[in-house]
Regions:
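Short, extreme N-terminal segment that most often corresponds to the first beta-strand
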Residues: 1-27, 31
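Low-complexity intrinsically disordered segments
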Residues: 37-132
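An exposed acidic His-Trp-rich patch
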Residues: 30-38
Length: 132
């Protein structure tokens, strides 16, 4: 059975950027870890620099595009879809993720998850408990 999830991406003011529906492996040790890995794979900057030696995201919306790209690239046909803001939490999801821009620009965003019990916490805190 599929472990479905949706990922809402919001800026630091709470404005909606994207809602990504992910049909399989939506549990924190799978999708949650992947989201953290994507967010940590580059540096958030305001304007790309020439001759850079590491991956950069030109602002938070560029990171949001990279999240969609990375999830879709590794999922094969189907499985990952863009939905409307109103669809968030209405597609039979087991987990609801939210990636929120950190108000302190240049820091990794907050990656949160709401579990089946309606509790919201940082994905990293869950992973730390599971791996302890």
């Amino acid at each position: 059975m599929a472990t479905r999830a949706s990922i809402k991406i919001s800026d630091s003011d709470g404005n909606f950027i994207a809602n990504i529906y992910h049909h399989y492996d939506g549990y924190p040790e799978g999708l949650g870890q992947k989201l953290i890995d994507i967010c940590d794979s580059g540096k958030l900057v305001n304007g790309l620099s020439i001759g850079r030696s590491s991956k950069q995201f030109n602002g938070f919306t560029d990171l949001a595009c990279s999240i969609v790209f990375e999830l879709k690239e590794h999922s094969g046909d189907g499985r990952v879809y863009l939905n409307t803001e109103d669809d968030y939490g209405k597609c039979g999801e087991d987990y609801l993720y939210e990636i929120v821009e950190n108000p302190a620009m240049r820091q990794s965003p907050l990656v949160l998850v709401e579990n089946m019990n309606g509790e919201t916490e940082l994905v990293q805190d869950i992973l730390d408990r599971v791996n302890a």
